[in-house]
C-alpha cells in the first residue's frame, strides 16, 4: 500500500517573549534526504523558557514508516557483568552503513541510576521499576513508557533501554519535573541548566522525536517535547561530554564520516 506523505503541522512557540523567527516551523532535513518524494525527517527549534532566549531545544522528527530506530550497545556502557562482549561492539554494524541516517547518544552510565538495558535477548542491566523505557519491538515499532506498562510485552521487544522517569507520559508532564531536578541529573556544580537530550514518540506511534536542549532544565525540555508533538518522552543523557547527534555520509574512500552535527560543536 502507498504510504501517506510525511508532514507535521507547525506548532506555536511556547512563549511569545522568548520566541525567535522560525520557531515551531517544520522543515525538511537535507542531510538525511528523502524517499518516495517525501522527507525522512523534519526539524524545528523551540525556546521553552518564558524569558531567556539562550534556552533552546532543537527537535528532529523521523518518519518511522520510512526509517527505523536501532539500539547499539556501547563498547563500555552500559557496564554489565552478564552480557556477552559479542553484544557490545560499540559501532554501527557494517550491514547498516549504506542506510544509516544518523546516530545519537543513549542513556546514563550504568552506575548513574542502574537503569536497565537489553539487546537481542542479552540483558545488560536488569529493568528498574518506575524507569522510563524506550522499547523497540521485533517488528520495528517504538514504544516509550514507564517499565510497568512495557514489562508485560517484553517478549515482543528486540531491545530496550531505560532512563530516569518519563519527562512526559500520555501527554502529561511528570509530577516532579518542575521542582525535583535531581531525578534527571544536574551539572557538576549542582545546577539544572545544562545540555540534555530526549527521545519521544507521538500519539500515532509513527513519529519519533529527538530533542537536544541547551541550558535547559528538565521542565523546559519536557515542554519543548510536548509542544513538538511527543505524547511520551524520555530524557536520554546530560552534559556536553555525553550528548551527541551526528549525520553521516561516506567519504571518497567509502568510509563513513560525520557530515554534520545537529547543533554546532557536538563532535
Where are these regions (language model features)?
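Zymogen propeptides
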Residues: 1-125
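Short beta-strand element of the conserved SAM-dependent methyltransferase core
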Residues: 60-62, 199, 219, 245
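C-terminal soluble interaction/assembly domains
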Residues: 209-211, 216-265
